[in-house]
């Protein structure tokens, strides 16, 4: 997960990180690398991901998945407009990449819906959850679309918490 974060406070002193990870800006005008308003930051960020995924000769020519927080956590709990996620969904569908949503900080009803991504009306291919689901217990999970989950052989992903009394 450290390869995915852009937070220097989490990366400093660790590494080397997994290769093949390309970062794109989150649509928050306050920290956006391009001079733009909040409304256009969401559109520009979505179009930039589409460009990375669907334009030949970019560094992202063989992307397996786009992983995104449905609500920016560490940057100030910023909810992007639904348009951003709709653009990501369309870009992933066009390129064949999976759209995986990180709901570790924002899921489990913390935004008024079970999952924050529901506010955008977008269905992800995968969803990561934790923190709020565990009620302060060490719980996390990953949910996939049923057609994708069926492709994973039984017991190919063992449970590393299996020996913990709380996990029984």
Annotate each predicted stretch with a short phrase.
Residues 1-168:
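Conserved N-terminal phosphate-binding loop of PLP-dependent enzymes in the Aspartate aminotransferase
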């Amino acid at each position: 997960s450290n390869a995915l974060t852009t937070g220097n406070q989490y990366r400093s002193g660790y590494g080397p990180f997994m290769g093949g990870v390309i970062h794109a800006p989150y649509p928050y005008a306050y920290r956006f690398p391009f001079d733009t308003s909040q409304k256009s930051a969401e559109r520009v960020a979505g179009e930039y991901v589409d460009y990375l995924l669907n334009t030949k000769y970019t560094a992202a020519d063989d992307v397996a998945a786009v992983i995104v927080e449905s609500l920016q956590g560490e940057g100030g709990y910023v909810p992007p407009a639904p348009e951003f996620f709709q653009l990501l969904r369309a870009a992933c569908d066009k390129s064949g990449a999976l759209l995986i949503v990180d709901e570790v900080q924002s899921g489990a009803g913390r935004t008024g819906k079970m999952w924050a991504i529901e506010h955008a009306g977008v269905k992800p291919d995968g969803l990561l959850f934790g923190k709020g689901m565990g009620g302060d217990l060490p719980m996390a999970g990953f949910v996939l679309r049923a057609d994708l989950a069926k492709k994973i052989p039984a017991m190919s992903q063992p449970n590393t918490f299996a020996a913990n009394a709380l996990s029984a």
